[in-house]
């Protein structure tokens, strides 16, 4: 029992353990809390399956700034074909470019020369002939040589024309074209009897034909060159006769006057002056930040600071207010919807239909395409007329900046509330300073006469009257703003009618 600690030692050990526990708890409590991770913005990935009229539903990286527009609203407008999709812009374009060169520019490859265009139109028969010629079917040996003891090995040579990895028209099955060899003609066995036409010492011909030198290839007399499968023949025919779909879409493009990139000729058109603008540039436009009115006589006053406005976006070409665009969808090759309609578009393409959009007034998506065509015709007439007219903002086919950024009203309301709180704080500080200054003056002038106290009371009454006038003028200003907004609303309704 000598090893058992005494009672005093047990109490001391318990105290040390409790002190260590409390000390450790304090240390743990004093540890700074880990900083909260900032809320990351959701990343937008390009999905090649989501396409409309040959363009994507997400930006293509023309602008590297923050994409603070409503991406869901933009996708909805593009899917309903009221806004042009995000096309991939071309840095340059030449009318003399061939389909091969244009396809290389679309895919971002170096532009090849017209003379160095790869032989994509080579006939299948030529390749088959070259493949059959390169295969040693039989070797005739002289009479003084013994027949080979081992079966000859088949030498498969690649095709004469190989396509580079940067070729935009590259066939995914091109690397297998040299494997079209009839294995029955090239498979030999030592146990199998030697055909009569391969026997070197016993020729079948009675007239004594000359022996063929060794190393010269011969094909069986009763064999024919293998034919390519029908799918390969069909692919070659389509490649030779018809250019790819993207080449048709990007042929004769137009240049965006803002980003100076070339896009397909079915871009957005401004409602006021019928000028083209791509969707990349359109979604970057926004209203100005809330600011006081510029036409106020004294914008630095309290009333001027409270009256904040956010003016609508003006047209970058003609400076007309309420900037909006109109999109005329493509009719013909490449016209297809995205999302749920991708399967229908693929089925239409498999059936050989060049257009997935009905030319009649009623489309599969419930969109009035006839109305869109009328708007497009009106825009074309506007561009050629001497006196240009504009399409109304209330037109259902016009997409304004406010539709792409619907949170502008919340931003304006927050700015006005912030300015009102700032003004209220300033008024409270001024009133407190005035009251404290008056009390000090009364306490310091205890020996003054009754006349001084009357002056102080008059100043207080004047200050109260001034505050009352400020509140009255603020109420009048708010009522005038409400009446002005009501008049503008009535005028817009009359214009729309």
From Swiss-Prot:
Where is the stretch described as Disordered?
1-52, 112-172, 185-240, 348-371, 438-497
Q: Which residues form a coiled coil?
A: none
Q: Which stretches are tagged as biased composition: Polar residues?
A: 136-146, 185-194
Q: Give the domain of life.
A: Eukaryota
Which residue stretches does the UniProt record annotate as biased composition, category Low complexity?
Answer: 112-135
Q: What does this protein do?
A: May negatively regulate the SNF1 kinase.
Q: Which family does it belong to?
A: Belongs to the SIP5 family.
Official protein name in the record: Protein SIP5
What phylogenetic lineage does the species belong to? Answer: Eukaryota, Fungi, Dikarya, Ascomycota, Saccharomycotina
Gene name for this UniProt entry: SIP5
